[in-house]
């Protein structure tokens, strides 16, 4: 694999050294749209768990501001098209991305970030590394 987001132990990317280096990209449940927008009548625990898009925008914006203030941090949003893709939510995401870009963020996918981290550390991804 090229990268992993399983450990949830920090706010920056780092490399698992070894024969095949793997980049650890930070994540947390609060950056997963599923945590806020999943809803199912079949699951009693989720019937009231869908949050307003504005609430999520403010939470993610505040987190971005703090990470940007600290510097050298990464904010990996985990987004599901069937959740974030709803009309009000996708507009919220567009607004958030615009805000982040206006404040100096580099918006990239996990594979691009992982390859950047490897290059910055003088390493190359294995030719057969899978972006997962």
Q: Predicted regions span which residues?
A:
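C-terminal domain-boundary segment and adjacent tail
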Residues: 57, 61-132
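Active-site-adjacent pocket scaffolds in enzyme catalytic domains
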Residues: 1-71, 121, 126, 131
């Amino acid at each position: 694999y090229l990268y992993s987001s399983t450990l949830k132990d920090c706010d920056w990317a780092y490399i698992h050294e070894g024969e095949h280096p793997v980049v650890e990209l930070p994540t947390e449940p609060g950056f997963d749209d599923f945590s806020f927008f999943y809803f199912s009548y079949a699951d009693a625990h989720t019937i009231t768990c869908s949050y307003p898009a504005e609430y999520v925008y403010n939470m993610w914006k505040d987190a971005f501001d703090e990470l940007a203030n600290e510097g050298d941090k990464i904010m990996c949003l985990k987004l599901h098209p069937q959740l974030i893709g709803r009309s009000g939510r996708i507009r919220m995401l567009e607004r958030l991305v615009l805000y982040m870009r206006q404040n100096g963020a580099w918006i990239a996918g996990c594979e691009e970030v992982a390859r950047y981290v490897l290059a910055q550390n003088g390493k190359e991804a294995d030719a057969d590394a899978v972006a997962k």
